[in-house]
Amino acid sequence: MSTVHEILCKLSLEGDHSTPPSAYGSVKAYTNFDAERDALNIETAIKTKGVDEVTIVNILTNRSNEQRQDIAFAYQRRTKKELASALKSALSGHLETVILGLLKTPAQYDASELKASMKGLGTDEDSLIEIICSRTNQELQEINRVYKEMYKTDLEKDIVSDTSGDFRKLMVALAKGRRAEDGSVIDYELIDQDARDLYDAGVKXKXTDVPKWISIMTERSVCHLQKVFERYKSYSPYDMLESIKKEVKGDLENAFLNLVQCIQNKPLYFADRLYDSMKGKGTRDKVLIRIMVSRSEVDMLKIRSEFKKKYGKSLYYYIQQDTKGDYQKALLYLCGGDD
């Protein structure tokens, strides 16, 4: 008989593969889409005295990414100017960041966020970790391709020159996007072996065998690892997250924690990140914007559901409390509704 865990795993698999990503996205393709009309309306909005931001927001947050690419193409054909450049001049602040993010393809957006996280002095490890830990094989392979196209260098090369030690090894292994895909066969022997190996390499021994942790957590499929982390609890007095906190520190600890949370429940991981970006004084807008833009066509509905379940109030409510103006309007459209 199937255990509850197997059923949940199967459901999460189906959520990730069998249904088109848009099924859980808050932004859908616009039905009566007309790229020429949208391009004309955006052109008029940009030329309006003081810029008609409302029209720009209304159009671009209510079109799918593919449709936005068509609008950009139509706009360039009309005006001989790039839509992104025109909007960069017309808008400012956080709203500009959201709108320019929406104009990029998902891989271009991730590639540019990764580049920004490693540019100049110091690395924004937080952004690097979030993107590298949460993207699928397919997404990572596409990011690698686009990154090289955009920056004439390999993503791996930039990660290597910007990070060090075991943290570098973990990031490089993940960035390759070579994790095993979820299969239909469940290998209980390997699940048990991996759970024991993770325990033997960490909590059980005096020092941590980090390469062993890295190889298991970056090579095995997501569904397999969900079962491994369950099984792990029968060997270790601590669960995987507690073990990580005991065994490693700094960026490596942060990366392993993010990775395990993504594997266990990705929508919940993003719900937590969104909550953290808005709690307390001041908003971490960079994180808020990146998640709202990058997940709007992937799993925003699941994220909203996890958010409400855990924090008692809706994501929509939190965004309303924490942001204002047309920036708020854009984020609320991407959120797709109140719960």
Curated annotation (Swiss-Prot):
Native source species: Cervus elaphus (Red deer)
Tissue: Expressed strongly in velvet antler reserve mesenchyme.
Residues modified to Phosphotyrosine: 24, 199
Residues that bear N-acetylserine: 2
Phosphoserine modifications at: 26, 184
Protein name according to UniProt: Annexin A2
Glycyl lysine isopeptide (Lys-Gly) (interchain with G-Cter in SUMO1) crosslink, residue number(s): 49
Additional detail: It may cross-link plasma membrane phospholipids with actin and the cytoskeleton and be involved with exocytosis.
Gene Ontology terms describing biological process: positive regulation of receptor-mediated endocytosis involved in cholesterol transport
In-chain residues carrying the UniProt-annotated modification N6-acetyllysine: 49, 152, 227
Keywords, alphabetical: Acetylation, Annexin, Basement membrane, Calcium, Calcium/phospholipid-binding, Extracellular matrix, Isopeptide bond, Phosphoprotein, Repeat, Secreted, Ubl conjugation
Signal peptide coordinates: none
Molecular function in Gene Ontology: calcium ion binding; calcium-dependent phospholipid binding; cytoskeletal protein binding; phosphatidylserine binding; phospholipase inhibitor activity
Keyword Transmembrane: no
Principal subcellular localization: secreted
Family: Belongs to the annexin family.
